[in-house]
Amino acid sequence: MADKKADLAGPGIGDYAELEKILPQDYTSLLSPKETQLATYAVKDYIEENMCKELNLIRVTVPLIVDVESGVNDMLDRDGSRTPIQFHISNDHDKNPIDAQVVQAATKWKRMALKQFGMGIGEGLLTDMRAIRKDYWLDHDHSAYVDQWDWELAITKEQRSLQFLKYVVEKLWLVLKSAEANVQKLFPQLKTDKYPNLPDKLTFIHAEDILDKYPDLPRKQRETEIAKELGATFIYGIGWVLKDGYPHEMRAADYDDWVTETTSEDGRPMHGLNGDILVWNTVTQRRHELTSMGIRVTAET
């Protein structure tokens, strides 16, 4: 039986011998280097514009470095194993010194920014965040340098539900699907049977149900199997301890809400208002995470 405790702390294969085995040896890009840059920015521009339209967001700028004392940097997980890069700014010969950190994530900053920018209910922000995560295992999915979208939406207490989470996830999925169609229109060579399109439907499944389906596999292998079967899935309830005694993955306690009780479609008690969109990567032949998101914690959760 495989070690089910493996990979609980997060991303990265952590075994380069294993990584070398699974990386494809015959991959060639469908686009030239120039076309790749044009296509990349076409996708980024399309997704940014349409996320703002669908979710009522405005684009803002997020800081690259923050004051340690501000408390707005993120630790990425709940065991403190991933620490940020920190450095001292003497600032006028140490008369006004600052101990600074490079951001690892903008989760806390975004919540503060909603208030700073005066966002009302149903309004939000989108930012293109750059960060350094020095303690990641580096592989074909993960880098120490992060360039990702971060967004935050102000919601009501009543909207803190699994139903609303799914509603937002489905809106985001439609944006991703339409971005796929748009870039294929610009670069028709991207539409090929070798690399099939993302499925139209995104399947929602709780981490507990994946454990039931693949009880002898560790987390990443479970994710790979379900992604291969479904093509695309939103796995929710990540962080709560499952029936085997382990969480699907450890998650920080001050990020998304993986504690709140929910109910499955067939009436079983579950936990968690967070999750990841995973797709089947036809190049690497394994799961690929597109986004991790969720309803934020409250003082109670």
Where in the sequence are the language-model features?
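NTP/phosphate- and nucleic-acid-binding module
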Residues: 1-4, 301
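Class II aminoacyl-tRNA synthetase-like tRNA-binding/catalytic domains
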Residues: 3, 7, 11-142, 150-154
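Active-site-proximal structural scaffolding
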Residues: 40, 44, 144, 165, ...
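Short secondary-structure junctions and interdomain/linker hinges
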Residues: 50, 54, 58, 175-179, ...
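General structural signal for secondary-structure boundaries
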Residues: 66, 70, 104-105, 157, ...
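Hydrophobic transmembrane alpha-helix bundles
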Residues: 93-111, 163-164, 168, 213-240
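Extended, charged alpha-beta segments that form solvent-exposed binding/catalytic grooves
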Residues: 122, 127-219
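A translation/RNA-centric and nucleic-acid-associated enzymatic feature enriched
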Residues: 206-301
